[in-house]
Design a protein with these regions (language model features):
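Positively charged n-region of N-terminal signal peptides that target proteins for export
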Residues: 1-5
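C-terminal motif of bacterial Sec signal peptides marking the signal peptidase cleavage site
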Residues: 14-17
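Oxidative protein folding and maturation machinery
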Residues: 19-192
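Short active-site neighborhood of thiol/selenol oxidoreductases, capturing the structured segment around
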Residues: 197-227, 242-244
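Structural microenvironment flanking redox-active thiols in thiol-disulfide oxidoreductases
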Residues: 223-260, 274-279
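Short, internal strand/loop/helix patches
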Residues: 259-291, 295-296
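Non-catalytic, surface beta->alpha helical segment in thiol-disulfide oxidoreductase systems
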Residues: 286-289, 295-320
Length: 320
């Protein structure tokens, strides 16, 4: 009996310790856990979207999982990045105050998760994704207003490496320029004939402020896409829309040479005082850059992807 017990124990121990001695187990990864649908008592579409935004990360943060070069909290890189992009798309569907509260709450959860294990790579990996999607000028979902609460947190967090603090502080200052709902900074510009105009002097229900350069491929793409809007010329002639293409660099010969390429019913000019860059009136990180302003020159969309600007105008002016 004792002999059988010893043999059984040895078999059990062998099963538990099977494999090469001391060999670490492979990391266990998971799919991104989508939030539960809104409860049945949440009936309005806007309320259901807000619910999804507010609970988007609940299941994700509820788990303890590995963060390494291949995954963030157990979710592989491609999956977590796609999920973050989905989250940002949802933020665009809720009021700005709801969106910025959500990103502020998300940053607090990021810090809390890192505090559970100070040696984890989680904070570093997740904040890299945040910056890539919300602040990179080439990101199709970039949004400085969404990013501001997070980058302010990153600038002050004990989990941020000291060498990154000045960069985050600078980004926070830049993102605070001309926020959603504020009146943008006014400036003067000259047209091709040397006449001086001002941004505030433009009269239209909506103004597209388009920082562009001559011979810029991406600028030409935006010009073509705007021109392809069926009702664009009618919107401009009726005063519903003005398009102001402003050149902010110093190669004026190129700008003058390129003038025939701009639509005749657009407002074109150059910053003859060079104050937009030198005084940093706007955070123009890359050309092209698009702002959409209301009649009072308040910000509706800031450094926005062209698709967002076009969709907004089509929605607001389609029946005009």
């Amino acid at each position: 009996m004792v002999k059988k017990l010893i043999i059984s124990t040895c078999v059990l121990l062998a099963a538990v310790s099977c494999g090469s001695p001391g060999k670490p187990s492979s990391p266990v990864y998971r799919s991104f856990p989508l939030p539960d649908p809104a409860p049945v008592m949440v009936t309005g579409e806007a309320e259901r979207i807000a619910y999804s935004v507010n609970h988007f990360w609940d299941k994700y943060f509820a788990e303890q999982a590995v963060t390494d070069s291949a995954a963030v909290l157990g979710v592989k890189n491609d999956d977590i990045e796609k999920s973050f992009a989905t989250y940002v798309s949802l933020l665009n569907l809720v009021p700005m105050d709801v969106a910025v509260k959500s990103t502020a709450d998300l940053f607090r959860r990021i810090e809390a998760k890192q505090a559970e294990n100070d040696s984890s790579l989680f904070y570093l990996r997740f904040t890299e994704i945040v910056s890539k999607y919300l602040y990179d000028p080439n990101s199709p979902v970039r949004n400085e207003d969404f990013y501001l609460p997070m980058v302010k947190g990153m600038a002050a967090s004990r989990f941020t490496s000291e060498d990154m603090v000045p960069a985050y502080e600078y980004e926070a200052r830049m993102c605070a320029l001309n926020p959603y709902g504020s009146k943008v900074a006014d400036f003067k510009f000259k047209d091709i004939n040397g006449r001086v105009h001002s941004l505030y002097g433009i009269r239209a229900t909506y103004t597209i402020l388009f920082f562009s350069n001559p011979y810029c491929t991406n600028c030409k793409e935006i010009m073509d896409n705007l021109q392809s809007l069926e009702n664009l010329n009618w919107w401009i002639s009726s005063g519903d829309l003005a398009v102001a293409s402003i050149y902010i660099d110093r190669e004026l010969d190129e700008w003058r040479e390129y003038q025939p390429n701009y639509p005749k019913n657009w407002i074109t000019g150059y910053d003859h005082n060079y104050i937009i860059r030198e005084d940093v009136l706007y955070n123009v990180r890359a050309i092209p850059s698009l702002y959409l302003l209301d009649a009072e020159k308040r910000v509706i969309l800031k450094d926005a992807p062209q698709e967002q600007v076009i969709q907004y105008l089509a929605r607001k002016l389609q029946n005009k």
